[in-house]
Design a protein with these regions (language model features):
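Alpha-helical transmembrane segments and immediately membrane-proximal extracytoplasmic
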Residues: 55-74, 98, 214, 224-228
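Membrane-interfacial loop-to-helix junctions in multi-pass inner-membrane proteins
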Residues: 95-103, 122-137
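Signature of the chorismate-utilizing enzyme
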Residues: 27-31, 63, 68-74, 79, ...
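Alpha-helical transmembrane segments
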Residues: 2-43, 85-111, 145, 150-151, ...
Length: 361
């Protein structure tokens, strides 16, 4: 809104032309969301603590984990999403369908996550709403959003699936694009949610993936760069860089409070929304497979849970001491800081591989 307001004065004040540059507004978006989260983080934590908005800890988890985490406020995703959305509303082009789709997914998944967090706090356990209700709600939200997006987006090849490393390998998914998009967005949302189990564990990988896609969305929306890199050019996609910048800034601000020992957890309010929004960005930029590479840590965490469940149902035995896999290493006696930093290193490597796919074709 602020961006569109300033455009009215470009002819009078020539220096305002700088706001037309996506890179400049991406930087503004990052620093705006960062500043907002840093400013409101402390008061929000005090408010949540005083109101006993505390995270119910799994009683079957590692003993050291239970002792350290008890009494920590949750629903910190409210802080993240507030900073993110205010920043995007200020510096994004709100007439852009891609930006609107990202905002829709973020708000919808955030509200669903907040409802889940509320139920956990209300009943003082880590169960919250049922898995069936959560997934069904995510599917319905995504179907509605992706249907409108496909209808209004100005890109005829939106249903194409592009493969990294192979410039001519393209599959037109047709109507299967909608269930595929649902799988990507819902899967991404729940994968980030599963990863958010240790202080700062999910936050840094989210920042890394958002950083990669800030670059990817910019070059995808630039006809010169997209032609040079031999990736699909999608008009208007560059605006998504501003959304990604807001994610980076708000998560950096949140990490200030979420770094070990965490003063607050993001809860499902943050993890479901951030995961869903990254999935949406992957769909918009037509880099869904690259999303799975850069967000490989999230994939690993989700797969570890699925493998654990399938193994137990088929054989009665568990492959891991506890799932998701970060709890397995906790059970083995690894210090929390060791697990978190090593998983961050994995995320950095995967992010570099994901970016390398843009050139290696």
């Amino acid at each position: 809104m602020l961006y569109q307001f300033l455009l009215n004065f470009v002819d009078t004040f020539g220096f305002l032309n700088v706001f037309k540059y996506i890179t400049f507004r991406t930087g503004l978006s990052l620093f705006t969301s960062l500043a907002i989260v840093l400013l409101i983080g402390g008061p929000f934590i005090n408010f949540f603590s005083n109101r006993k908005i505390l995270d119910p800890i799994r009683d079957d988890g590692p003993e050291d984990h239970i002792i350290k985490k008890i009494g920590t406020p949750t629903m910190g995703g409210v802080i993240i999403l507030f900073g993110l959305l205010v920043s995007v509303l200020c510096w994004g082009d709100l007439s852009n369908i891609s930006i609107l789709f990202c905002i829709y997914i973020t708000i919808s998944f955030g509200l669903l996550g907040a409802f889940d967090d509320y139920k956990k706090i209300q009943h003082n356990n880590s169960s919250g709403i049922s898995s069936k209700f959560k997934i069904l709600s995510q599917i319905l939200i995504t179907i509605l959003g992706i249907s409108f997006f496909v209808y209004f987006v100005n890109y005829q090849e939106i249903t194409n699936l592009y493969f990294p490393f192979f410039k001519n390998l393209i599959i037109n998914l047709g109507w299967f694009f909608i269930p595929f998009s649902v799988f990507v967005i819902v899967g991404s949302s729940n994968a980030v949610n599963l990863t958010d189990g240790l202080d700062g564990l999910a936050t840094v990988p989210v920042i890394l993936v958002a950083g990669c896609f800030a670059f990817i969305s910019y070059v995808t929306g630039n006809i010169v760069f997209s032609d040079y890199l031999q990736i699909p050019y999608i008009e208007g996609t560059g605006e998504v860089s501003i959304f990604c910048g807001a994610i980076i800034g708000s998560c950096l601000g949140f990490l200030w409070f979420n770094a070990p020992p965490a003063k607050i957890f993001m809860g499902d309010t943050g993890s479901l929304a951030l995961g869903g929004s990254l999935g949406a960005v992957g769909i918009i930029t037509k880099h869904e497979i690259v999303l799975a590479i850069t967000g490989g840590l999230f994939v690993l965490e989700a797969v570890s849970v699925m493998v654990q469940v399938i193994s137990f149902k088929l054989t009665g035995k568990r492959i891991f001491r506890m799932a998701p896999i970060h709890h397995h290493f906790e059970k083995k006696g690894w210090p929390e800081s060791t697990i978190v930093i090593r998983f961050w290193i994995i995320s950095i490597i995967l992010a570099m591989i994901g970016l390398a796919t843009l050139k290696l074709r």
